[in-house]
Amino acid sequence: MNKFAPLHPKVSTLLHGADYNPEQWENDPDIIDKDIAMMQQAKCNVMSVGIFSWAKLEPHEGVFNFAWLDIILDKLYAAGIHVFLATPSGARPAWMSQRYPQVLRVGRDRVPALHGGRHNHCMSSPVYREKTLQINTLLAERYSSHPAVLGWHISNEYGGECHCDLCQNRFRDWLKARYQTLENLNQAWWSTFWSHTYTDWSQIESPAPQGEMSIHGLNLDWHRFNTAQVTDFCRHEIAPLKAANASLPVTTNFMEYFYDYDYWQLAEALDFISWDSYPMWHRDKDETALACYTAMYHDMMRSLKGGKPFVLMESTPGATNWQPTSKLKKPGMHILSSLQAVAHGADSVQYFQWRKSRGSVEKFHGAVVDHVGHIDTRIGREVCQLGEILSKLPEVRGCRTEAKVAIIFDQQNRWALDDAQGPRNLGMEYEKTVNEHYRPFWEQGIAVDVIDADVDLTPYQLVIAPMLYMVRDGFAGRAEAFVANGGHLVTTYWTGIVNESDLCYLGGFPGPLRNLLGIWAEEIDCLNDGEFNLVQGLAGNQCGLQGPYQVRHLCELIHIESAQALATYRDDFYAGRPAVTVNAFGKGKAWHVASRNDLAFQRDFFTALSKELALPRAIATELPPGVVATARTDGDNAFIFLQNYSAQNHTLTLPQGYRDCLTDAAVSAPLTLSAWDCRILRRHA
């Protein structure tokens, strides 16, 4: 077998659980025993404990109370339930803010925060670092060998930035280490524009609405600095935990669509990835677009650790209370969306939270146990049903996703694109564009890794780089080597425009990729909303492109150098100009798509490439609209998750040799999937 090792030797199956906050119920101690009995009923085998417990653990400075936590961990262990034990830095006690105001953040507008909320501490504060070191050390010394503890949940949803004097000084120190001299910094930031040249390090301030926000290199470096800050703070939290027991793995929960930090760098501090997923199901009539978006983020979380299974640390079995509408999941959707995570590489399904809070800001957030106090509810029964399903899938734990396709979704590129001021200030739609390129593979059941531009390209047959506006040093050389050795690279409009400082490449776009792509991009036309062009395949083109395909937003005007045109624009003054090209390069090919084309184009183009490269599919059958197949494998067996994201039943024909993972019965064709249904099949690999 070829599986990843479990998170902990105690773990032999998939995990099922939730955030558990027993400190909220200290005035009703009978609830704890009732909760644990219901956890067993739902086949939960893990709980995240202590995430926001600092005020309970240290009610007064230097006065610690661990007795309640001792009881909780012992009771959970006795019931066969493991624990991700949290460090409590996500929210600090009021006494700390009152006595040490330097732990409070200062906003971008330079206004200090008051005590309240969460995730708003200054990561530069020596006091906060001292206090987190102290509480983490005590937790590690007391619990790192507790038999219930599987690993550490570091803080919670790190986010945000601080602009206090301490952070300004750390930022300047970070810049000195990066650039060495002010001359180098001024050159990288092109600060001669508008006479913004710096003559002393003390003149540099973080971006501010009443100060400097026009230097894009500064803005980029501020993002990078904040990533370095949180990574350093995370390592600071981890150090005493590893000192007590180096074998316990550590994680912190990431978030979807998150903008503040570069998760690729923060991931290096962690042993495994966990994240919080809250799709707004049933917002649109067609669920497939959201299902595709969510699948892409699952794939990114898996890719952050080279394909290692991740933990779905938070989700909701019902509705959230912080999104615009608190829409209930239709019957079956909770199980379907949870199994989607497992299909894409999760070895757990967990919720926020186990029991609904009685008061405060998330009292109406979905949970397993509602205010009624039991799980004989629609949601409770679905959670129990999912627990039963997960308990029957021990073979899936640790299985791999074998992706021969990678799509680059690069956070530094995202920051630079959004800040560039042109060519489309209405929004460059980077995430949406990446997902539009991901979708044809998801629909066909072709596995995809979602990577950043610094990841090794050699494991893949096909790499797609939508709008890789920023090409950092080294990427072009690696891309050329990848294609020369037989790989296929697809780029798009607005690629190869700037370097890592957001300085435009001179000598013609796409900059250092010009030789590989065999084109020169002279101009780019931004279409008004509601304005469209068309792209038409040339007769006999090697992809079989036909069309016309509708084009929106962006049309790049390119010249052929060594490439071959496959399709051209049909309208406007650039009618007849190349719109899709391919350049033979060594043993491989470099493709370029010069315009933002419709889904029909994406399907035709990437289906052609998939056939040319004989990319493996999860299952060799035609899938009806709304039905997708996702596979994991242990090397001997493949586990196929057939998912129906529509409100209609669908019937499909299966090849021979499949068995149902839950019943071990042979699966005969045709197979019918009910609305919001998921079937898990096994075949010999």
Predicted feature descriptions by range:
Residues 18, 39, 47, 76, ...:
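Conserved, mostly hydrophobic/aromatic
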Residues 11-16, 43-45, 77-83, 145-150, ...:
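Short, well-ordered coil/turn segments that N-cap beta-strands
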Residues 97, 109-296, 300:
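Polysaccharide-binding and catalytic clefts of secreted carbohydrate-active enzymes
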Residues 1-46, 59, 74, 396:
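N-terminal carbohydrate-binding accessory modules
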Residues 33-41, 48-112, 237-244, 469:
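Aromatic-lined substrate-binding rim segments of carbohydrate-active enzymes
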Residues 201-204, 235, 247, 267, ...:
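Carbohydrate-binding surfaces of carbohydrate-active enzymes
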Residues 16-26, 52-67, 114-133, 155-162, ...:
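The substrate-binding groove and active-site-proximal loops of carbohydrate-active enzymes
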Residues 25-40, 132-138, 255-265, 330-338:
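Short, acidic/polar
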